[in-house]
Swiss-Prot record:
Zn(2+) 1 binds at residues 164, 167, 218, 221. Residues 10-75 form the J domain. This is Chaperone protein DnaJ 2. Homodimer. The lineage of its organism: Bacteria, Bacillati, Actinomycetota, Actinomycetes, Propionibacteriales. The J domain is necessary and sufficient to stimulate DnaK ATPase activity. Zinc center 1 plays an important role in the autonomous, DnaK-independent chaperone activity of DnaJ. Zinc center 2 is essential for interaction with DnaK and for DnaJ activity. Residues 32-63 are annotated as: Disordered. Residues 32-56 have a biased composition (Basic and acidic residues). Keywords: Chaperone, Cytoplasm, DNA replication, Metal-binding, Repeat, Stress response, Zinc, Zinc-finger. GO terms for molecular function: ATP binding; heat shock protein binding; unfolded protein binding; zinc ion binding. PROSITE patterns: DNAJ_1 (PS00636), DNAJ_2 (PS50076), ZF_CR (PS51188). GO terms for biological process: chaperone cofactor-dependent protein refolding; DNA replication; protein refolding; response to heat.
């Protein structure tokens, strides 16, 4: 792709973001497009593959502050003006190219702008293949409620793109090797001129910037040099993780290319519910059934903890149904080493059936209590 073609592509439009979009907005937009169009999810869908590649190209430029600045500068020269041209014919015009380019590039000057964009600031140079960061990988795991509170290590089988083992990343069939591109002599770059005035370098159209041409492609990766790789890995789930939370593990995604860093692993955690306890942030919740006499007269009851022990909880006389008591320090661990609390909510247990003696006792209690109704809407 020539520099002019590169500048004329609207990467902002491809990702669906504004020209002043923040890095996190660009990252979010690219992830959505990549997730919806990833070749692994749409095998054989050329349109989805094209959208994925186009979005990857746009993200590669816009997510890099230096490349984004150069791209915006190139757009101001080529994209918005329909191409950079000197006047031809008619009156001779004296143009100070250094001043013009310094103005167009916000003061960076001829050497900085064209040196960065075209790979040279005076004369031709050979460009090496730049490192590329590996793709991020998504994974899922399901753990118990107890493990979510205390933290655990899980074994996960992850599928990612890695150098093809069959061809060792060359893209060529086993027993063969790629040949050096005769067009660029292995540099991966091709010289072209802009109106006979400037000489620029751009990715070689024959080898697409690789410097090598695969004539007999690998049957596993079909010449790409990359293939699906499944590996088993130990993943640490931190204490206090919540149901549905995504955990980022740096450097555990797909391997990079040409010495680039590996991508990240994002693990979505599903937590199985507990029979007794619930969660409210860093607090644990538990329902404590009490009898009517206990709630009315007061009592001390034992309340379970997630550690398997119990604590004594004092129920004051006249405790209403639904009142919550706080047991400090018996909740979920925080990152600073402290813990949340245990929230114990009283639930008055009503017997489903009574024998005659018990019924008479309740009736006598009813008759001895004040006749005022507890329902405010019935008060006259």
């Amino acid at each position: 792709m020539s520099t002019k073609d590169w500048a004329e592509k609207d990467y902002y439009k491809i990702l669906g973001v504004s020209k002043d979009a923040k890095p996190e907005e660009i990252k979010k937009a690219f992830r959505k497009i990549a997730r919806d169009n990833h070749p692994d999810s749409h095998p054989g869908d050329k349109a989805a593959e094209a959208r994925f590649k186009e979005a990857s190209e746009a993200n590669d430029v816009l997510s890099n502050a230096k490349k984004r600045k150069e791209y915006d500068q190139a757009r101001s020269l080529f994209g918005s003006a329909g191409g950079f041209r000197f006047p031809r014919g008619g009156a001779q015009t004296s143009v100070n190219v250094e001043d013009f380019l310094r103005t167009a590039s916000n003061g960076d000057g001829f050497g900085d702008l064209f040196g960065n964009l075209f790979g040279a600031s005076g004369g031709r140079r050979t460009a090496s293949r730049s490192p590329r960061r590996g793709a991020d990988v998504e994974g899922e795991t399901t753990i118990s409620f107890d493990d979510a509170v205390s933290g655990t290590t899980v074994t996960m089988d992850m599928v990612s793109q890695a150098p093809c083992q069959a061809c060792r990343g060359t893209g060529a069939r086993a027993g063969t090797v790629p040949r050096v591109c005769s067009t660029c002599q292995g540099s991966g770059m091709h010289a072209s001129s802009a109106g006979g005035v400037f000489e620029m370098t751009e990715p070689c159209p024959d080898c697409h910037g690789r410097g090598m041409i695969v004539e007999d492609p690998c049957q596993v990766c079909h010449g790409s040099g990359r293939a699906k790789s499944t590996k088993s890995m130990q993943t640490r789930i931190p204490a206090g993780v919540e149901d549905g939370q995504r955990i980022r593990i740096k450097g555990k995604g797909s391997p990079g290319e040409n010495g680039g860093k590996a991508g990240d692993l994002y693990v979505k955690v599903t937590v199985r519910p507990h029979e007794i306890f619930g969660r409210d942030g860093h607090n644990l919740t538990v329902t404590v059934p009490v009898t009517f006499p206990e709630a009315t007269l007061g009592a001390e009851v034992e309340v379970p903890t997630l550690a398997g022990t119990t604590v004594r909880l004092r129920i004051p006389a006249g405790t209403p149904n639904g009142r919550t008591f706080r047991v400090r320090g018996r909740g979920v661990p925080r990152s600073d080493g402290s813990r949340g609390d245990l929230l114990a909510t009283v639930e008055i247990a009503v017997p489903e059936s009574l024998d005659d003696d018990a019924r008479h006792v309740v009736e006598r209690l009813r008759d001895s209590l004040p006749q005022a109704t507890p329902r405010p809407w019935e008060v006259k």
